[in-house]
Amino acid sequence: MRTGCEPTRFGNEAKTIIHGDALAELKKIPAESVDLIFADPPYNIGKNFDGLIEAWKEDLFIDWLFEVIAECHRVLKKQGSMYIMNSTENMPFIDLQCRKLFTIKSRIVWSYDSSGVQAKKHYGSMYEPILMMVKDAKNYTFNGDAILVEAKTGSQRALIDYRKNPPQPYNHQKVPGNVWDFPRVRYLMDEYENHPTQKPEALLKRIILASSNPGDIVLDPFAGSFTTGAVAIASGRKFIGIEINSEYIKMGLRRLDVASHYSAEELAKVKKRKTGNLSKRSRLSEVDPDLITK
């Protein structure tokens, strides 16, 4: 959506950081070259991303987002998977569009705590939706054994499975369901970065371990705080991250340990409180009038 950034590439084949526009840079990636995509595009709700305000006409935003999704489908390998997050308001439109291109395998709910002020005239949002989808419903990567969690049986004693001969202790581990409980990243956490929509490392780790293998290429076209990249590299994957904001590019260079022209001081981590949301009136006064929803 935002243009005017001269693209710059950092890194190598194992970890690539691209400072540029997501859609423009996606179009440069070869077809069927990526194993896993995690996309967390703007929600168009007026977030302030280090001075860049997201507030566009709804029809323009949706058209742009659909074009991004189409490009993601093009670059994804036939056995690849894509995860996409967005707001509860936008996800129904995204869901319908993605059905035309992919097979949707899971509709995931990221359920989190919310200590902030909640809505007073409707039910406040306590989750964000995630779609997991694949190109080939019969042939895609899913490593269930890599993401097992403890099953909640409600019993205080070890259960015995008498269906087996001889009887054996009941297996308390299972593949997670589609409601994921991960706390949001807070200021006092070690993983905290100065980004208003930072996602937890644990959430990305589950996605990457489940839907890719060591050596696979993971793409994040809206890299943001580069959590996807940090987790991908730590998990033995290759990574391509696209980001338009220069301050967030610096985060990625530091977190992925990629060489650049920036000094150590410029890349140093300085913790600040999250950038606050703007009110509708405030954000509409700070963006291009041609993009404002009338």
UniProtKB/Swiss-Prot annotation:
Q: Which Pfam families match?
A: N6_N4_Mtase
Q: Does the keyword DNA-binding apply?
A: yes
- SUPFAM superfamilies on file: S-adenosyl-L-methionine-dependent methyltransferases
**A GO BP entry:** methylation
User: Domain of life here?
Assistant: Bacteria
How would you classify this enzyme at the top EC level? transferase
The record's CDD domains line, in alphabetical order, gives: AdoMet_MTases
Segments carrying the region annotation (Disordered) are 275-294
Q: What happens when the gene is disrupted?
A: Mutants are viable and show no significant growth deficiency and no alteration of cell morphology.
Q: Which InterPro entries match?
A: DNA_methylase_N4/N6, DNA_methylase_N6_adenine_CS, RM_Methyltransferase, SAM-dependent_MTases_sf
Molecular functions (GO terms): DNA binding; N-methyltransferase activity; site-specific DNA-methyltransferase (adenine-specific) activity
UniProtKB keywords: DNA-binding, Methyltransferase, S-adenosyl-L-methionine, Transferase
**Name this protein carries in UniProt:** DNA adenine methyltransferase YhdJ
Originating species? Escherichia coli (strain K12)
Gene name per UniProt? yhdJ
